[in-house]
Amino acid sequence: MESMYLILAKLPEAYAPFDPIVDVLPIIPIFFLLLAFVWQASVSFR
C-alpha cells in the first residue's frame, strides 16, 4: 500500500513538463465556440 502512495507522490514531478499544456486546456472549449461562430458566418448562418 505504501508503494502506491509513493507512485502518487511522484506523479506531479513526472507531469511537470506538461504544465504548459494543462494551463491551455481550459481555453480549448472557447476556441471550439469561436470556431462554431466562424463556421456559421462562413456559411452565412443558414
UniProtKB/Swiss-Prot annotation:
GO terms for cellular component: chloroplast thylakoid membrane; photosystem II reaction center. This is Photosystem II reaction center protein K. It comes from Tetradesmus obliquus. The keyword Repressor does not apply. One of its GO terms (biological process) is photosynthesis. Its main location: plastid. Signal peptide: none annotated. It is a single-pass membrane protein. InterPro entries: PSII_PsbK, PSII_PsbK_sf. One of the components of the core complex of photosystem II (PSII). PSII is a light-driven water:plastoquinone oxidoreductase that uses light energy to abstract electrons from H(2)O, generating O(2) and a proton gradient subsequently used for ATP formation. It consists of a core antenna complex that captures photons, and an electron transfer chain that converts photonic excitation into a charge separation. Keywords: Chloroplast, Membrane, Photosynthesis, Photosystem II, Plastid, Reaction center, Thylakoid, Transmembrane, Transmembrane helix. NCBIfam families: PRK02553.1 (NF002715). It is found in: Plastid, Chloroplast thylakoid membrane. It holds the Pfam family PsbK. Residues 1-9 form a propeptide. SUPFAM superfamilies: Photosystem II reaction center protein K, PsbK (SSF161037). PSII is composed of 1 copy each of membrane proteins PsbA, PsbB, PsbC, PsbD, PsbE, PsbF, PsbH, PsbI, PsbJ, PsbK, PsbL, PsbM, PsbT, PsbX, PsbY, PsbZ, Psb30/Ycf12, at least 3 peripheral proteins of the oxygen-evolving complex and a large number of cofactors. It forms dimeric complexes. It comes from the Eukaryota. The chain crosses the membrane at residues 21-41. Belongs to the PsbK family.
